[in-house]
């Protein structure tokens, strides 16, 4: 069976990639990622049991989160690293099984599929005798890449034959991938929440359960949105407690004459470590793409060698990384297949990887040594200037709520007629120019609320302000969509409305990968309706599942700029 992947917006033909991913991943990489997800589901069977028995599941929790994150679009293209992850997962699964048995669980090795223990709860995966039946994901084992390849042929997306069940399982899985990304960043800063891990396990096991109906899976998808809100709140707490609340900031987009390091991705812990280790070395630090919001945090402003932001959204990195001249550190997705001209200047860390690119691992104490990349930078020319000037951001919930009287007054007087939430992702497709044109064409009495790399379609336009309030309010990274929800809920309270949908807020969201999926599910959980997704609806939504979202939540897509503005403003 050839590869099949349809988890991102750029799925070939709007259906799925079957030869090579538009993202650049090969058939082998795609299938290995499928196998990682399968192994993770097997681990979840055991870890959910171990958790209920009060056993330590921290190693499994960490592995599940990292593994889900490693399979997100544009995160890891390193076959060796991914195969190692499969091997590690099988060891963790075996360790969990051993712990359960030691704690009183009895495993019938002769039958090889029956659990019998008063300590173990029923998974919901049963046989005709109403006994526990352990899924193949919990018992399959192998120890070499060739056997991995054979197994991977059988466990991909299309292994679920029913189109609607498949759609719901994948929607849930992609929501979990987005959740894992946010949880990883929170965990890196020392923040965790056991209930989120428990839900992830429960949901992963549910995707193996053939007894669950479409209605039951739909309920789980919506529950995923609840935990999406929780994980974004946790990450917001982690970021703001550690680095302070983002504040209105003018960010330099030009360059200086010193050698520099460009840091891309989302991990603020990596940002902190890099700034500390480069201080006093003569090497400057620039953010790229989704790392731009690091400029808004007070804790990072003390570093005089932190210059500003270089470049635009992730998909332009080929030309921008080439022009930067210095080394690039990818802390998370999005990686585009690197050009030979800069591949030797590229470094990955965390769950990211690309074959032939140097990877920086943490030491036993969790610290990362960036000395190699710093010394590399010293040997490089300073960045080539590709633009100059400033952009403004830092409008997360704390900052906007500080401006609440001004904002509320502007709404009451009619100076602001409507807010447009245009959070989400940017991407390669030319149809995404719609969002630039949309921003330009919006009436002058409207304000854009944004988060994520979607901002690059309009954050350098001169759209002016309304009574001193910029018409583009950038809250930060994609996870800072949480801030936009907090702002909306506060406005609902201020205006004494019963329903969040009564606010003068429209949602025109550009999506690309799985973090956008968890943001969408979180908004649905909060009761937001009539969200428009573009430039296309997800390929993983079957007609029937899409119909559920349309009928129950008013989900729509985009048409033309003029038609959409007319529709939103009425």
Swiss-Prot record:
CDD domains: HCP. One of its GO terms (cellular component) is cytoplasm. [4Fe-4S] cluster binds at residues 5, 8, 17, 23. Keywords: 4Fe-4S, Cytoplasm, Iron, Iron-sulfur, Metal-binding, Oxidoreductase. Gene3D superfamilies: 1.20.1270.20, 3.40.50.2030. GO terms for molecular function: 4 iron, 4 sulfur cluster binding; hydroxylamine reductase activity; metal ion binding; peroxidase activity. Hybrid [4Fe-2O-2S] cluster binds at residues 266, 290, 334, 425, 453, 478, 513, 515. GO terms for biological process: response to hydrogen peroxide. Coiled coil: none annotated. It is found in: Cytoplasm. The keyword Transcription regulation does not apply. Its cofactor is [4Fe-4S] cluster; hybrid [4Fe-2O-2S] cluster. It holds the Pfam family Prismane. The modification Cysteine persulfide is found at residue 425. Its EC number is 1.7.99.1. It catalyses: A + NH4(+) + H2O = hydroxylamine + AH2 + H(+). Its main location: cytoplasm. Binds 1 [4Fe-4S] cluster. Belongs to the HCP family. Catalyzes the reduction of hydroxylamine to form NH(3) and H(2)O. This is Hydroxylamine reductase. The lineage of its organism: Bacteria, Bacillati, Bacillota, Clostridia, Eubacteriales. The gene is hcp.
